[in-house]
Amino acid sequence: FLDKVKTYMNEQVEKAVPIYKRSVDTHEARERFRLHGMTDKDRLFRYRRVSRVNLYSLGDFEDYYYGFMTYDTSYLKYFGLYLYDNGFILQMPEKKAPETVPAANLSPKVFQVQRESERWGEQMGISTVADLNERITKGNIQQMMLIAEALQEQKIAKIAEQIAEKKTVKFVLIAGPSSSGKTTFCNRLSIQLSAHGLTPHPISLDNYYVNRVDTPRDENGEYDFECLEALDIDLLNQDMTKLLNGERVELPYFNFKTGKREYKGNFIQMKETDVLVLEGIHGLNEKLTWSLPAESKFRIYISALTQINVDEHNRIPTTDGRLIRRMVRDSRTRATSAKETIAMWPSVRRGEDRNIFPNQEKADVMFNSALVYELSVLKLYAEPLLFQIEEGEPEYQEAKRLLKFLDYFVGVPIEDIP
């Protein structure tokens, strides 16, 4: 079957079938969606604050797509089709090599946690943005929020139970990309570990940064805080080994203002029920904790995989959700503007591709921190930040794209969160 699909796609590429774009008013677009049986799009545009919609057609097929479309099918000649699970993967080139189709990056554990999150969404009756918007406007969003939180808490409780059952585990290593929710998860897991009779000690790996003057620099001469060598690996292993052997250790504190390591009398000595919960982007990299016995470590990977789609034909990129999370967080806790966050995001993403994603399948357990309703909450905080970016600034187009994306969602005031 897949060979026939690929043959047909290649035939369409050879024919260079044009893709037409036309702008229609929203009322007409909704009528056409209903005509085509696309009720998800009809419901979606009930909440869009736009007067016109761009529709695209290929032959007799007409649809709406979030993002830009090419002129004709001849531009789509580079692709790969691979059977996977109960479906298939459509593999496209990456921006850095537009004429090369990379091998399919199969990540079974990531795929399974995505499927789990989709099941949670189906359990709540929410699989698209339209489903979410309808729940919000009908006023029964709070129950759905409580269910979403409860499902996550059940998962965290099960992870804590797994750790408690492994009597040899002394180090819980938590890793994940930027704004995936590592710190929040670390705190929630610590509560569940306490409920199992353990004494958790949350430790941020950021406190093991080398002094700023010793931080490696990237290809542009800028400090590379996201490479493994930005951490004092020798000191970390020395401290953790001493703790494992029952010695009393003073843990460091990294002062981000001075860029130097400090000691503030934070002493720890591990007893039988003590567990160290280490959180940082390199937590799953074996080079980070090379001296610690394998049986003493339990690895957890945190992702933020959005479990709903814009509609049946348009997905929500996971990176968009994390970027919006980071924008709001940086503004509230680090006095960083949305403009600055957007400007540094490509560098953050490069660091993730290099240092984090290659290690994700090493996890003993994966946890998806994304909540089905979170973009509706973040919308009210992110939009004012994005509107501060002026036309003509390098980050304006990205800000405009994110504003368009957030416009799909009906906002939820913070006071409505249980």
Please give the residue ranges for each predicted region.
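Post-Walker A helix-loop "phosphate-sensing" segment adjacent to the P-loop in P-loop NTPases
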Residues: 191-201
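Conserved nucleotide-sensing/catalytic segment adjacent to the nucleotide-binding pocket
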Residues: 201-203, 210-258, 275
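Hydrophobic anchor at the beta1->P-loop junction of P-loop NTPases
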Residues: 172-174
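Glycine-rich phosphate-binding loop used to anchor ATP phosphates in small-molecule kinases
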Residues: 237-295, 342-359
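Conserved NTP phosphate-binding and transfer environment spanning the P-loop NTPase/kinase superfamily
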Residues: 167, 286-418
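Conserved glycine(s) of the Walker
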Residues: 181
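Auxiliary tRNA-acceptor-end handling modules of aminoacyl-tRNA synthetases
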Residues: 1-154, 159, 166
